[in-house]
């Protein structure tokens, strides 16, 4: 399931988002904060607007998120930096990066990787 939220024009599919109370928009997350969501589409202009952008955002379940670092084949605990995910097995929170598919190529920074948000 997804919801449509206000965002910035530079948000792309797979960006990890958090709510910014100053702008009242969902922007690229700089750290692991709760709640968080993942953009399932690129930002587009809001209907009947020339200045406001919206994005479809997933907050729970399986979704593709952008990797900020290379992701090990075994996956691991999810952490966030610069609007993207990486493995941090010292983290304790609501998400994981799933293991790589058998015989698939290595997942590198910038790739979309499957994450589970609880």
Residue ranges and their predicted role:
Residues 1-118:
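Surface-exposed, low-hydrophobicity beta-strand/loop segments enriched in small/polar/acidic residues
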């Amino acid at each position: 399931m997804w919801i449509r939220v206000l965002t910035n024009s530079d948000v792309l599919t797979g960006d990890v988002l958090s709510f910014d109370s100053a702008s009242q928009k969902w922007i690229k997350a700089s750290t692991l904060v709760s709640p968080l969501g993942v953009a399932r589409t690129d930002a587009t202009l809001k209907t009947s607007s020339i200045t406001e952008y919206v994005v479809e955002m997933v907050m729970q379940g399986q979704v593709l998120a952008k990797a900020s670092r290379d992701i090990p084949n075994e996956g691991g605990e999810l952490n966030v930096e610069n609007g993207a995910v990486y493995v941090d097995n010292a983290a304790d929170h609501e998400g994981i990066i799933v293991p790589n598919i058998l015989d698939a190529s290595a997942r590198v920074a910038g790739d979309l990787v499957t994450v589970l948000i609880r």
